[in-house]
């Protein structure tokens, strides 16, 4: 692919694209007014924050006759982001075709019936635009960033890509080699490896337990028919959202959608492909390698899907645990109690909590990198903090976590691309864009009592999934880890 021509980003895992958690990017909350204790500034700050929330542009949504949803937010910028969010990912695959969705994403920019690969790259470059794509376990996304005046061309290119890709045999063979090399690179990224293992043990023998890239033998055998069958089965109007943000007119976007997708994307004529259930299993995977300098460990319990009422509360609990790295500094002044204990005891190099949500299940847990001698101590402190969430978390801690969560969520909506991503994801997950004031109210409704109740429901005395790689001789056995999921009385 020509340099700076077509940017393609691969999301290896819904859980891993940003360890802050998939749901944290889905549920975009409002910002409470930051209290500035300088006389009248406190009131003005609160009023200003409220005014920002009220001034957020409306998200307009229209559904075409074929089921395709068109959603946009017009902020009047000179640039825009427009994309297709498709309810199709590796979870809809089986053992034989696992890896097809990701393979298809690789083929997206390799030429269509109207444009060769070179023509496509030159057109994008001449527009000053960028094309991007990624695959997760439940979604596939194609989007473009361009000048607002080029919105019609961007939509036409996206329509051409998903409806008219040539999927030539030569290009398939070339991308097969690219994906195999990509798999080798993933194997050197221990964070990626650990999260693949975590899904494999948590969702054994189910679609969520399989990797997005697929096994090597599948990559070597996937052919054009497999790719065409996947498109024919899953790329249907009711499962696609055309989302846009920036300087976009919803009426113009709607007309473009009708012209490019109104007749070509049909509804399901037969039975709609069902989302296979994925049962969580408390279990472990250990890959011991004493030659490695550091131990990499992930521990998680089963959480909930996107639309579950407890999602917000689990996100606040996730923020309470927080994240830490040796470069942070701060010492005992860190907001996270776990970060204070970790820093004071020099227990690990870094840790990061996560809350990964899917349609009907999720993983709530922590990923950490430790010295071999401190693995057991670090895990003990983590589990002790989890138990504290269930029994004795304070109102002041919860209030601080709520403010931090709302701030982080708002900060992520910086520019047309993250806003467009938020629109696309929320439309697939909730069939609407949840207003910021509503999310702000839902976060504010959480208190310490609710945190204790919900954490007891999902964490206390639950069997976790554990994935560990490296020098993990000191890691306690699984039965001991499970016993520490209960409060230990002295």
Curated annotation (Swiss-Prot):
GO cellular component, one term: mitochondrion
Organism from which the protein derives: Bos taurus (Bovine)
Residues bound to Zn(2+): 102, 106, 182
Location in or out of the cell: Mitochondrion matrix
UniProt family annotation: Belongs to the peptidase M16 family.
Gene: PMPCB
Entry annotated with the keyword Transit peptide: yes
Primary subcellular site in the record, as a coarse category: mitochondrion
One BP annotation, GO: protein processing involved in protein targeting to mitochondrion
Protein's UniProt name: Mitochondrial-processing peptidase subunit beta
SUPFAM superfamilies per the UniProt record, alphabetical: LuxS/MPP-like metallohydrolase
Cofactor(s) the record lists: Zn(2+)
Subunit structure: Heterodimer of PMPCA (alpha) and PMPCB (beta) subunits, forming the mitochondrial processing protease (MPP) in which PMPCA is involved in substrate recognition and binding and PMPCB is the catalytic subunit.
Broad EC category: hydrolase
Record-annotated active site: 105
Positions marked as site (Required for the specific determination of the substrate cleavage site): 192, 196
Taxonomic lineage from the root: Eukaryota, Metazoa, Chordata, Craniata, Vertebrata
Mitochondrion listed as a keyword: yes
């Amino acid at each position: 692919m020509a340099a700076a021509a077509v940017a393609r980003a691969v999301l290896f895992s819904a859980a891993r694209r940003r360890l802050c958690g998939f749901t944290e990017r889905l549920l975009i909350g409002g910002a409470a007014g930051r209290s500035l204790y300088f006389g009248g500034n406190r009131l003005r700050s609160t009023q200003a924050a409220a005014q920002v929330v009220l001034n957020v542009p409306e998200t307009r949504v229209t559904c075409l006759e074929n089921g395709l949803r068109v959603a946009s937010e017009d902020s009047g910028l000179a640039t825009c982001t427009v994309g297709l969010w498709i309810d199709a990912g590796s979870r809809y695959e089986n053992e034989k075709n696992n890896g097809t969705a990701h393979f298809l994403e690789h083929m997206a920019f390799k030429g269509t019936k109207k444009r060769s690969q070179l023509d496509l790259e030159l057109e994008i470059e001449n527009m000053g635009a960028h094309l991007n794509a990624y695959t997760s376990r439940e979604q596939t996304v194609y989007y473009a960033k361009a000048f607002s005046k080029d919105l019609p061309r961007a939509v036409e290119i996206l329509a051409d890509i998903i409806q008219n890709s040539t999927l030539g045999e030569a290009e398939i063979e070339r991308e097969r080699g690219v994906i195999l090399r990509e798999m080798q690179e993933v194997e050197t990224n221990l964070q990626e490896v650990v999260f693949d293992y975590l899904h494999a043990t948590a969702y054994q023998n189910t679609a969520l337990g399989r990797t997005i890239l697929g096994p090597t033998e599948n990559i070597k055998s996937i052919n054009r028919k497999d790719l065409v069958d996947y498109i024919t089965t899953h790329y249907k109007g009711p499962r696609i959202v055309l989302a846009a943000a920036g300087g976009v007119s919803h009426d113009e976007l709607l007309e473009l959608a009708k012209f490019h997708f109104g007749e070509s994307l049909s509804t399901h004529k037969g039975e709609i492909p069902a989302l296979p259930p994925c049962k969580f299993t408390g279990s472990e995977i250990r890959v011991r390698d004493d030659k490695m300098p550091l131990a990499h460990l992930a521990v998680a319990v089963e959480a909930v899907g996107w639309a579950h009422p407890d999602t917000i509360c689990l996100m606040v609990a996730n923020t309470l645990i927080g994240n830490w790295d040796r470069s942070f500094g701060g010492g005992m002044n860190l907001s996270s109690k776990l970060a204070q204990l970790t820093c004071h005891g020099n227990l690990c190099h870094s840790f990061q909590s996560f809350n990964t949500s899917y349609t009907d299940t999720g993983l709530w847990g922590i990923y950490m990198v430790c010295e071999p001698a401190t693995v057991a101590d670090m895990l003990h402190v983590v589990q002790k903090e989890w138990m504290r969430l269930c029994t004795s978390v304070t109102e002041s801690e919860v209030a601080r976590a709520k403010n931090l969560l709302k701030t982080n969520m708002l900060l992520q909506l910086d520019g047309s691309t993250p806003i467009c991503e938020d629109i696309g994801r929320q439309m697939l997950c909730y069939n609407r864009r949840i207003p910021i004031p509503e999310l702000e109210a839902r976060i504010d409704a959480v208190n310490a009592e609710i945190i204790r109740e919900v954490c007891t429901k999902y964490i206390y005395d639950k069997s976790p999934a554990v994935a560990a790689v490296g020098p993990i001789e000191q890691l306690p056995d699984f039965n001991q880890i499970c016993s520490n999921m209960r409060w230990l009385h002295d």
